[in-house]
């Protein structure tokens, strides 16, 4: 199977600063591929190189069978892009935004007339077709941005932080719409800071930091290999003495702020020891992708 996207030994520098460092990526048709990393990891620069908007210092890139940046305009005709921030035209209605974008891709009036009603239905905006963009909620604008990115029936949909700033209801509706695209065979490249989003949608992940790949695999494989046990979060006062006492019951422990994390393969003894402890609260849960991300990239704030 021919990959829709390939990067081989791609490097990008700004001055003497290495932003992307010999990065390899490969996205197969039908995948939802998650590109994860903290702020400053190189995700945005990677996307810009893939689209031919900035040139790598070295390495090779292929997008939809086209070499990048040499044939980036041709490749972009087969790609849909959902940017991190909406760039809809506020002077036009919902339906006009879709029609105008269709013309950018050279679609005929007949093609636009056929596709627009289906995209309005996909975005659940049929009743708001004539509404002005400025009158839409944030969730509606985001759904319209996704629908607009599909106007050219792209081989690859690139989504940069697709649900940032949305409330939980709007976020779940976007997830449901994206799952319907994946069920229909679409290919998605996704960046996100919501680990739940990546765990729900992606069937393959790559974690980068400081421009380098530090982990890759399926979400459940990364959770098993990097964490491999349950997590008990403990909140309260005087956690250090509790840590000293209960550490033998855990594979490892970690203190961050006012939370003590126990990583345990057999949680029952630890839970029994915590039961009835005054001044503490605790939560026992399975390990998740956020645990993996924080283990790999650290818990320090990134600007």
From Swiss-Prot:
It is a peripheral membrane protein. It is an enzyme of class 7 (translocase). It holds the Pfam family ABC_tran. Residues 5-235 form the ABC transporter domain. GO terms for cellular component: plasma membrane. Its main location: membrane. This is Nod factor export ATP-binding protein I. The lineage of its organism: Bacteria, Pseudomonadati, Pseudomonadota, Betaproteobacteria, Burkholderiales. The gene is nodI.
